[in-house]
């Protein structure tokens, strides 16, 4: 995912309205116009991945997020230097599988689209979904609307039909605990597999 706090992260002026949260007033540390240099952020991102791959033992996969930003400006996608990053990852740990959501360059080892995927894939799939509707993090407005065990079973069936893994997210509460609705749902799904 993006580090929205980094002053040179993709900005809304260059990369569209979804690149960063639209704070009012705008975040003072964000760089715009001639002051913005995406390459500083790209190097920061590479250094973060280097830290993960050199300080924490063997890693199975790197799952890059935020694909809508580079895809919003196809003529500028090369500025993200994605293939260089993929090659760097494999130079540090050759076994690492690399994914950038549904695929940015077509050289990813697997695809990880959100929620729904139609069609076929020439690489393995991992479908990503949430127990809260519309949110990857805790959102109080979703109280009482979390997904049921039946809905999770439907997601599992959809993933199985695609021969895909299901990555199922629960947004933790502010204290780090799992929402009681999600605990109940996951316990019920677990019972169905016993």
State each model region's role.
Residues 1-194:
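Mature catalytic domains of secreted/periplasmic carbohydrate-active enzymes
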């Amino acid at each position: 995912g993006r580090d929205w706090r980094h002053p040179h992260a993709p900005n809304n002026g260059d990369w569209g309205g979804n690149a960063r949260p639209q704070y009012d007033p705008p975040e003072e540390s964000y760089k715009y116009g001639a002051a913005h240099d995406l390459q500083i952020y790209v190097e920061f991102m590479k250094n973060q991945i280097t830290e993960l791959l050199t300080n924490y033992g063997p890693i199975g996969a790197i799952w890059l997020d935020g694909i809508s930003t580079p895809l919003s400006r196809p003529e500028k996608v090369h500025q993200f230097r994605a293939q260089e990053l993929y090659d760097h990852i494999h130079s540090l740990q050759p076994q690492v599988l690399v994914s950038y959501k549904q695929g940015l360059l077509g050289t990813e080892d697997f695809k990880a689209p959100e929620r729904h995927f139609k069609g076929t894939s020439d690489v393995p799939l991992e479908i990503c979904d949430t127990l809260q509707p519309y949110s990857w993090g805790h959102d109080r407005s979703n109280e009482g609307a979390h997904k049921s065990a039946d809905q999770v079973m439907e997601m599992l069936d959809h993933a199985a039909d695609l021969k895909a893994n299901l990555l199922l997210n629960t947004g933790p509460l502010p204290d780090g605990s799992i929402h009681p609705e999600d605990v109940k749902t996951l316990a019920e799904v677990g019972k169905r597999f016993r």
